[in-house]
Amino acid sequence: EQGVIDRFGQIEPKVLFCVDGYFYNGKTHNCLDKIKSFTARLPSLKQVVIFDYASLSNIIINNSISYQEILENYEAIEIGFERVGFDHPLYIMYSSGTTGVPKCIVHGHGGTLVQHLKEHQLQTNISSGDRVFYFTTCSWMMWNWLVSALGTGATVMLYDGSPAYPDNTVLWQFADEEQFSHFGTSAKYIEMLMKNDVNPSAIFKLSNLKVICSTGSPLSAECYDYIYNNVGYVHLASISGGTDIVSCFVLGVPTIPVRRGEIQGCL
């Protein structure tokens, strides 16, 4: 709760979108009590919109309305897209808060989109019609990076829940059924698969998969071997970036060889 106050208290939001709860590792987690508590500490709020995602019983939260109520009274209108300046604020990211209260980092429309298009199309080989997945929460900058794939005409694939529930192959089943072209994850996840002797290629076809991205920590040479022996012949890219630039410092290069334990290119 304090983490929300430390961040949102600085920007004084007027509208806040929340979910009543979420599912993880086979369990339902209720968020309503926390929402009621921290929204009471944000005096700038004029409206709290709650998505009935986990179908939990409602509690009374000041100035709240369900998303379903909004839809019931909604009449479709033509969307008007406002033209703004290249550096017009797009979204606010936050520093980790390890050296004090998290710092607000404002990213602009033009710079963010151009950088992401460059990284997607040139470094990650994303094309129109591709199906791009990155296992990430909405609070990680990889979420913002993933969403920008829409700008290339790709389909963004989303997964909500544990990557190991009901078993360690759940994400690969998703990748196979939905024909992922790009699969993004963390080095820790790949290491977990390796330690548990998970062999996705023995269970799934993964015929459309062409790129695997790994980030969050260095990808060991043994994990490179694991991917090529147990997933298939793909472009494996160990990438690294940061919230402050909401993009990458180093990532893949599709036109040069992949060498085990090494990052391909610096931007």
Where are the regions that the model predicts?
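Conserved AMP-binding/adenylation subdomain of ANL enzymes
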Residues: 111-131, 140-181, 196
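Short beta-strand->loop structural element characteristic of the AMP-binding/adenylate-forming
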Residues: 1-38, 104-106, 155-163, 192, ...
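Gly/Ser/Thr-rich phosphate-binding loop
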Residues: 152-154, 180-184, 194-259
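Conserved pre-ATP/AMP-binding loop-to-beta segment of ANL
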Residues: 49-50, 61-94, 101, 109-116, ...
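Conserved S/T- and glycine-rich ATP-binding loop of Class I adenylate-forming
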Residues: 89, 95-98, 120, 132, ...
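Short Gly/Pro-enriched turn/cap motifs at secondary-structure boundaries
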Residues: 81-84, 261-267
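Conserved helix-loop-beta element of the AMP-binding
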Residues: 14-15, 33-48, 131-133, 157, ...
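ANL superfamily adenylate-forming
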Residues: 15-86, 196-197
